[in-house]
Swiss-Prot record:
It comes from Aspergillus niger (strain ATCC MYA-4892 / CBS 513.88 / FGSC A1513). The active site is at residues 820, 863. Residues 11-257 form the Lon N-terminal domain. Its main location: other. This is Lon protease homolog 2, peroxisomal. Belongs to the peptidase S16 family. GO terms for cellular component: peroxisomal matrix.
Amino acid sequence: MGSNSGRTTKLPLVPLPKGSVLLPGITLRIPVSNRPDLANLLSTIVDRSAVAKRDGTAITFGCVPLSSPYLSKDGQRLIDDGSLDEDRREEFDMIDAGQSRKEDLFRHGTIGKVIGIQRRAYSEPALVVQGVQRFTIRRVLKERPFFEAEAVVHDEKVSGDAETVELFQQLRQLSRELLTLLRLSSLLPSPGSRLSPLIARKFELFITKSDVSHASRLADFMADVADSGFEEKLRILASLDVKIRLERVVEILTRQLQSIKSNVKVTTITTNSFPSSGFDINQIDPRDREILARKAMAGLSGLTPPGLSAGRNNDNDDKESNEVDELQQRLQEAQLSPEARKVADKELRRLRKMNPANAEYGVCRTYLENIADIPWTKMTEDQLGPETLKRARKQLDDDHYGLEKIKKRLLEYLAVLRLKQSTNRDVERQIESLSKELEASDGGDLEKEVPVLSETDRVAVETKLHMLKTRRMGDKSPILLLVGPPGVGKTSLARSVASSLGRKFHRISLGGVRDEAEIRGHRRTYVAAMPGLIVSGLKKVGVANPVFLLDEIDKVGGANFQGDPSAAMLEVLDPEQNHTFSDHYINIPIDLSKVLFIATANSLDTIPAPLLDRMETISLSGYTTVEKRHIAKRHLIPKQIRANGLSDGQVVLSDEVIDKIITSYTRESGVRNLERELGSVCRFKAVQFADAGDAGRLDAYNPVVSMDELEEILGIERFEEEIAEKHGRPGVVTGLVAYSTGGQGSILFIEVADMPGNGRVQLTGKLGDVLKESVEVALTWVKAHAFELGLTADPTEDIMKNRSLHVHCPSGAIPKDGPSAGLAHTMGLISLFTGKAVPPSVAMTGEVSLRGKVMPVGGIKEKLIGALRAGVKTVLLPHHNRKDVKDVPQEVSEGLEIVYVTHIWEAIRQVWPDAHWPGQHTHFIESRL
């Protein structure tokens, strides 16, 4: 029976890397990179080291492993995997030794003695520490800048009772069998990976010469050599009773030997002729013991584990091993998800056993490098301070003029993010308080005595804790689709969003993508397989919450023999699914819920309905003339002046000149052509400025661009603007039109003429089918109400008898279509038949029905701007379009008199207020349908 006594001392502590346990008599490398606590500890004891050397003692500190969620902190009770809370598992996976708290430490540790500093090529420096003596933490005195605790150091004594002696003999027998297996060269494929005869001889001498007084050291040594798990080593460290420790090590060795023998047919050889004199464990070189342990843990795979080489002079093996060590360090720093950690550990074990010359070695290493490059948990912290919304609004306004809808939606998202962050902060504080209370009752608080909670109180606290965890608000970023014509700033707007949020930005061009594998990656079985565009983008930005621009999503290829790329985007753009997005190459769930996706498209027609349903659509209309003028003055003109080598003030364009360029030389929804034309103007002035400078007459240079110069610079006008007539005439009405290219509107004259005939109606002006039907509806209404309008003397008389009509819309080369000219056609027919002229300062738009109702139409904003520019004073609009006038610039709404009508009779009274119509009081009751 082993016993131990202890003495209390104050001890600095060093948390060991995750998965590492230091036992007495064993050496361990502790990397010093990314370990501020270790650096602070070493700098603190560096003064003591001089004194220590004079006293003949070494530098020592306590080496404490991190606790395991599957084992109680005292190492005596295993926790069932099924009962383990998922949050505790994830919390353990995220623990880093350099950032650990006292709650993360195991209760037992080993005093370590620094025996050297090791630095290999291509590898980080590390302290080489040898375990000396077990200790138990009583209470932690401080956590920062390094841990310091009050600990009980245990002095071990091994009793010589029969049961202990029997266990010791059994341990020696099992150790010999393991040594025999290690020495069988037939199990090892290459001479370079065989166990060195010198190391084997030292190992054999140590096992044979050990007597029962060395039982504790032999048990610790074999526990480190054997293929034991992290929790098993923690239990051995916590076994202060030598007898219990022997039982556990015997169990581990028995299991490992049975596993080896089940796979390989082995004849066991034992040796009995060894002297029984005492033997010191330090006779075995620490590096030799480390090599021996790593070979045993490799499971007799035949390959030397990374970080070690069988021969001392094998530089190539050292280089390959150090590369794998570096890869392991990168994986540890990557803070992988639990699923990714499990896969990475498995692949890393495979990589350690592979020969670097093996073709699969490069594939496996590339796969692990890709996993390490993915930002699993690293995120950009959103700038969500008190000035967040104000700063974001200013950023968006500085970068883009107009586009109020999308700006409003993005500011809403920022406000929601800020509120969620505030709520989560309060919830986390409550969770932390309850967790500490629960851990203290379990004996986790080492500093003070806390009464144990009753079962009822424990259940109540755990229930409240669970409810608080469900109150955490997740950040599901919206998935926005910006739809609009080319050149309106969809792509640059997404970049401004990232800038206002302070996030990384990445653009993915989807135009012409026809292979599903480009989105989701190729399977690892293919040669040169790589991740898809989404995962590659995450690797490039290096954070898990960037802004992704999916450009031209409407131009993604359809289904073909290579798959359907648009179908592959369904999982990416579904907020309910993309937190477990699976790339074919990585084949591990990746959380995309933190990514803010902004897609752009010119049209919705080619986007599949299921994909469109997953996105929040925001339509961006083309810029109006007023907006283009502001954009030109604030952005385009200064940009072109700088691009052409000029300075501010060397090119001056008045509002009149800018408007002339917009209306007469461009007709587009965006501003790309406008920028080109402004560039032409700047280059023209640059030539003039250069000529004046060469001639020494800079004072003669005129920076102002006049209207007369425009035709010389840009050529003849490409588009002629319609201007309102000064005099009205019967049959001519001013309508309103919004160009299909978007962004611009104008007036459109509708001319109606009659002639003797047989009732035929002729339509010219390149009119579309809908516009032709609109003329027919207008004519039918006028014919049906000819008596009420005073056009016929009898209700049964046909106004079209012996008469034919010709309806024409000027600018015959331009296609025209749509129902919005119905009201103008009706008023034109009434004007022709009554001989009353429609005032030229009045324009109108609206669809009409056979009942005479005026129904809403689109393009109101563009039409009103065009009407004001053409000199119109009054505009008749459908009553249901009142809501659209809110989007009109203030200068337009104030410059026009806007009249809303619901019926043709209301429009008639507005156009001819002084005229009398026989049936104007009965039109709401009477119906001719």
